[in-house]
């Protein structure tokens, strides 16, 4: 069998439709030509160092092994299996693992059906781009706070030179581990058109949408109570504190996400951006909760009075970013048509990049007063002893400005340097207005 097995540095042309799962084409391949089977293995390591300066709330400067992973794939004719496992920060973390069947039609269109655990199509353009191919140390905060990551599901994707249509259905928890209730379910899609699509430049416009019925939760006074948490770190992995921009939404029931994106690149310049809006609806069994509240001396008397004192409303959040880069020298920027994302640096290269990001997790009723000492909003506009509960959400708004310099030694090794200025607006942290972050990364991938 040895004459059929090779271990070599190959271009992997036969895997061209699958190589997007790796940051670069895998170096190691085992192949059995007789059985038409190919097996690849790759790895990635990221080590970050960061210095932070904040107005009041401390952040932990230092260094961390932020990512370490092993990646494997197997191809048999039109079948493709991929598995990716992480060991960063000293813990095991399952990444992508899926099976895909793909065929090409007579019009050069690609049809692919995928089943497994991987990034939601509507997760955002940033989340669909591998971090090893990203042009910044972290994805934009809005993509992390309002986008969606990996889920267990099944999708169908159609791609040709000018169009990508990617849609599917997903389960909320990949292991069906819920304390109460049932697993959540979502349907999502991303649709991209490319008016310009050549080897040297690409212009694309995209739309994505996602509807999710949330699952899980806890039993509270004999009522199922579901919650949704949203948040982001300050675009860093050394200290992933989300206190500056995060919220937990009790009684969350459904979410609806919509996003728009645009991307342009030529040989030495790129610009891309996204806008995202998230709507969260609420639901609860008010009658049962009201009856449970009557078991003590303090009661609201009627259901309508209790509902007025405990208001429930739909929340809206939004955010977006714009990123740009200029290649000083190196191989031209390139576009991955199958994934509809910008590729990473290839070979020896030097680039400068810049980004503006806005994340809005404040949804505050006009005229309400906030007590930082009690971490509480007061609907009447002043502090009271027995106030109604507020439906305001003060998760925090963040404006972030980043500049960076990236140098790639070769197709395997790269160093990155980012400086970010964050402007924070969160009622619970009134003394934190400006945060500075200086970060560096060493990246190795094969």
PLM feature segments, named:
Residues 10-18:
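Hydrophobic h-region of N-terminal signal peptides that target proteins for export
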Residues 27-53, 57-215, 316-317, 321, ...:
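Outer membrane beta-barrel
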Residues 125-130, 137, 215-242:
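Acidic/polar loop-and-plug regions of large Gram-negative outer-membrane beta-barrel proteins
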Residues 22-24:
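Subunit-assembly interface segments of extracellular/virion macromolecular structures
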Residues 55-57, 225-446:
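Outer-membrane beta-barrel pore domains
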Residues 2-8:
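Sec-dependent signal peptide recognition
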């Amino acid at each position: 069998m040895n004459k059929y097995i090779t271990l070599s540095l190959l271009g992997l042309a036969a895997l061209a439709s699958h190589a997007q799962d790796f940051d670069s084409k895998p170096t190691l391949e085992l192949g059995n030509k007789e059985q038409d089977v190919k097996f690849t293995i790759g790895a990635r390591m990221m080590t970050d160092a960061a210095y932070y300066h904040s107005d009041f709330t401390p952040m932990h400067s230092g260094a961390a092994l932020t990512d370490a992973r092993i990646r494997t794939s197997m191809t048999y004719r039109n079948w493709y299996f991929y598995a990716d496992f992480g060991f960063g920060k000293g813990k095991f973390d399952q990444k992508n693992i899926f099976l895909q069947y793909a065929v090409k039609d007579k019009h050069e269109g690609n049809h692919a059906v995928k089943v497994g655990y991987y990034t939601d199509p509507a997760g955002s353009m940033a989340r669909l781009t591998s971090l090893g191919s990203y042009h910044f140390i972290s994805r934009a905060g809005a993509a992390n706070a309002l986008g969606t990551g990996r889920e267990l599901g099944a999708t169908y994707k159609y791609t040709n030179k000018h169009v990508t249509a990617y849609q599917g259905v997903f389960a909320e928890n990949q292991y069906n581990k819920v304390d109460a209730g049932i697993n959540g379910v979502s349907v999502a899609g991303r649709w991209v058109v490319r008016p310009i699509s050549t080897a040297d430049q690409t212009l694309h416009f995209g739309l994505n949408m996602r509807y999710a019925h949330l699952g899980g939760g806890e039993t509270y006074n004999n009522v199922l109570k579901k919650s949704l948490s949203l948040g982001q770190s300050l675009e860093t992995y050394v200290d992933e504190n989300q206190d500056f921009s995060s919220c937990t939404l009790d009684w969350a029931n459904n979410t609806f996400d919509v996003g728009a994106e645009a991307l342009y690149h030529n040989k030495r310049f790129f610009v891309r951006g996204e806008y995202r809006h998230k709507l969260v609806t609420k639901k609860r069994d008010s009658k049962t909760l009201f009856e449970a509240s009557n078991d003590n001396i303090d009661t609201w008397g009627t259901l309508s009075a209790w509902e007025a004192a405990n208001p429930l409303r739909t929340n809206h959040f939004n955010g977006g970013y714009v990123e740009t880069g200029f290649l000083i020298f190196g191989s031209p920027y390139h576009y991955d048509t199958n994934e509809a994302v910008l590729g990473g640096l290839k070979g020896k290269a030097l680039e400068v990049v810049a980004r503006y990001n806005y994340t809005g997790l404040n949804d505050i009723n006009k005229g309400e007063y906030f007590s930082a000492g009690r971490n509480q909003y007061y609907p009447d506009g002043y502090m009271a002893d027995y106030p109604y509960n507020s439906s305001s959400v003060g998760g925090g708004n963040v404006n972030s400005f980043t500049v960076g310099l990236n140098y790639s030694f070769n197709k395997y090794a790269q160093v990155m340097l980012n400086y970010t200025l964050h402007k924070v607006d969160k009622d619970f942290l009134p003394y934190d207005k400006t945060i500075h972050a200086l970060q560096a990364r060493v990246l190795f991938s094969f």
